[in-house]
Amino acid sequence: MTKPLPEVSPNTWNFLRDPMITPTGFREYDARWKYPEEINLPGMTALGLGLGTQIHKRGIEPVIAVANDYRDYSLSIKQALILGLMQAGIQVKDIGPALSPMAYFAQFHLDVPAVAMVTASHNPNGWTGVKMGFERPLTHGPDEMAELRDIVLNGDGVARPGGSYEFVDGVKEAYLDDLVGDFKMSRPLKVVCATGNGTASAFAPELFKRMGVEVVESHNEL
């Protein structure tokens, strides 16, 4: 694995080819960077290779559920991450766009040990990041993040055979089914559902309607 550089000049051949990762993006419980100022797509591939190497190092079954939030660049980020995971010999189950809790739900629904959710959470556009874990229902804590950081930044990722990719449809529907269950409103209720044009806009209105709530939608477009 090529050792990532902390900085590469943008709009150059090297920026398109060489992994760049700002070390401070590795935090206690997840990873977060400004994109593309602090991490580039090759850098995200290096992160995937490092995460896959960590999974093998821990002796965990090499299967992972992967998802992304609604940001228009998150799909590219996820695909770069997946490339690194596959390079590390990981079987990838791509569930598409999702909420973070839905990605964690997918670990149990698909019976896979690991998860990686491409999201910058509440950060504004221009940020990206990854929430990850491989000891369900736990996500990475300080020890796991420190180990991952060292693997990635030291260039210790190991390529292995056996990587694969599968797009898994239907997880959103299963997630909503699980949330709603057999719940029904005991009395009529009218609510304004305003998600701020976030990822929840693809879930919340349908969820409330299925519960029997009259929904007034506001700012629910991605």
Predicted features and spans:
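Short glycine- and Lys/Arg-enriched binding-loop motifs that mark or flank ligand-binding interfaces
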Residues: 26, 92, 125, 192-194
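Gly/Ser/Thr-enriched, mixed-charge loops and adjacent short helices
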Residues: 15, 128-222
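Active-site flanking residues adjacent to catalytic metal/cofactor-binding acidic residues
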Residues: 29, 68, 118, 193-196, ...
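Residue-level "edge-of-site" marker
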Residues: 39, 98, 120, 220-221
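An N-terminal, well-structured beta->alpha segment
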Residues: 2-83, 87-88, 168-189
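Short, acidic Gly/Pro/Ser/Thr-rich loop/turn segments
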Residues: 54, 123, 198-200
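Ferredoxin-reductase
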Residues: 59-136
